[in-house]
Amino acid sequence: FKKATVFNIMFEGFITYGGMNGRDMGALAVGLNESTEFNYLESRIEQVAFLGKKLVEYGVPVQQPFGGHAIFLDANKFVPSIPRDEYRAQALAIELYVVGGIRGVEIGTVLADRDPFTRKNRYPELELVRLAIPRRTYTNNHMAYVAATLKNIYDSRDEAKSGYVIVDEAPIMRHFTAKFSKI
């Protein structure tokens, strides 16, 4: 163990650093410090709210009040024409990526996984798509693009009649690696 720790120090940092090198720990410290500054927090919350308000203006169903890191699209209201067992939130997330190159994540039936005994899907009350906004990365012009893309998808939502079927899934935590096929 002692001989191996020498190499650990050279390649990953000190053995008590949890596998993080000094550069990464420094970046983490900067991020933690920034996240306590009022101006940063105000700017961050305003950017998320900017996107949320645009979506509300366009009639796109979102969860309110807006948070400080993400906007949550309400897939049950966005695409009610897609049956729940065809993963409507996942279908919406895929459509957003295909149409606009915008990545979101399904927070719904896929994430809720199957009942461990019956292996049937568990259907949560909410079917959401989370649009997490990375910090210090995007401008309000990017947020306007996201909003316009979602408006276009929402305006053509009546064309969405079917969703997806899972063709491969892990026995637990399927949402990380499941594979889907369009119905």
Model-derived features with residue positions:
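Active-site C-terminal subdomain of aminotransferase-like
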Residues: 1-89, 94
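Flexible glycine/proline-rich, aromatic-decorated loop/lid segments
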Residues: 1-6, 19-23, 98-126
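PLP-dependent enzyme catalytic core of the Aspartate aminotransferase-like
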Residues: 35, 99, 111-183
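Acidic/polar loop patches that form or flank catalytic/metal-binding clefts of enzymes
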Residues: 40-41, 62-64, 102-107, 160-161
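Functionally constrained cores in energy, signaling, and assembly domains
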Residues: 61-63, 70, 75, 104, ...
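Active-site lining segments that contact anionic ligands and/or coordinate catalytic metals
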Residues: 66-70, 91-93, 99-102, 125-130
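Glycine-rich beta-alpha junction loops
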Residues: 68-69, 77, 110-112, 137
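Structured loops at beta-to-helix junctions and adjacent beta-edge loops in soluble globular domains
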Residues: 74-76, 107, 134
